[in-house]
Amino acid sequence: NITVGRGIEVGHIFYFGTKYSNPLGAKISNKEGKTEDLHMGSYGIGVSRLVGAIIEAHHDEKGIAWPFQVAPFKINIIASDELLKDDNISKLYSFLIQKYKDVILDDRGITFGKKIKDSELIGIPWTIIAGKNYIESGKFELVNRLTNNNEKKSLEDLEKFDFEKNFS
């Protein structure tokens, strides 16, 4: 059975044979020590096409939903303006940047809601929110971009949490 579907070329292989090696006189020695013409090929992966294919396969009505392993940023911390200078926010950001490298602390001067929408749109796998809940209970909201699951976690919980293992 043949299934017909749409696809995108993300890589290619071209076999040139001896088309280029013969004019150059390029030869190799085989296992028996005999000289043979060199056979050539070209192999490539289109990185920009690969990114497009990943986005095509991993998006929803909110925007991109990057797989954790290839996400340009793994975690986005969103804090209300009055909490941006909070010691726990700084500690959390420092810890996460050392462990995961690709972490954003969104300190743009735009509304809280816009920051959350932007995080969803660009597909950051995890968003940590420090807002009203943090002020009331000292717990952050941890939101999974794929499932939209929202959990309350303390700073200590987040430092122990394995963001890569728990992303699905």
Language model region names:
Residues 1-168:
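NTP/phosphate- and nucleic-acid-binding module
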